[in-house]
Amino acid sequence: MNICIVVGARANFIKVAPIIRAIAKAHEEGRDISYKLVFTGKEDDKTIEDSLFDDLQINRPDFYLGVDCDNLNELTGLVMSKFELYLQHNPTDTVIVVDDLASTMAAAIVTKKQGIRLAHIAAGTRSFDITMPKEINRLVIDGLSDILFTAGISNNNIANKEGAELNKVYMVGNILIDNLRYNHSRLKRPAVLDKLGLEEQKYIVFTLNRKALIGDEAHLEKLIKAMVRGMKDSTMPIIASLRGKAAKVVADIVASTSFPSIMKIIEPQ
């Protein structure tokens, strides 16, 4: 069986790592199974540094579609055309997609149009806000998928209510937990704790990945202020693990408030 695993962002690699390791193990045991890892972005994407793959103990992608643009509709079209070419030149039995990105939806559409079996990891996730682009992506991907892997009973119920056949839905739990279990013995105290003089369990980790929030600084500022007001200890350090535009937006907000003394922006570790 030839499996193609499609990822569209850094976080996707973390979710597919356990699957890649399971496929590799099955292959070593003599089973007729192999995989190709396809990244929809560029090879020089700064968010997927070598240390990411070292930490996850998986290889870098086998193929890069090279798509990089901010307009989601344009991105969708480019991924569709380039992924179609990939499938035409690489025999594939099953395509696995993860989460709810525009690139994920694009790959899902092409897969079904090519008559290839489609599996979706993190299926049945809903915000019930159809104005969110990702909610549209989720509905499309789940609607097209032949196999839906869900994280819990509530996700199963959503998939079933939306018409998914029972024999297509598999509750496999939160796949991120597999990574924690796999890496538990290798986990070390992050060097950044010592660098910033932090004590264990006495700091807050803050991250941000919603484009809608990044683009609405006024709303984001309200959320950050609400977070600080809700803290039991107003002096507790907040570690913001951010890069790129998200880091700049948060830095600008912090600079205009009284938070600089407690909020520290660092590169994702």
List PLM regions with ranges.
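N-terminal beta-loop-helix "entrance" segment that forms/cooperates
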Residues: 42-59
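Generic beta-sheet signal
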Residues: 38, 121, 151, 172, ...
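Short, conserved active-site loop motifs that form the nucleotide-linked donor/cofactor pocket
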Residues: 62, 169, 262-264
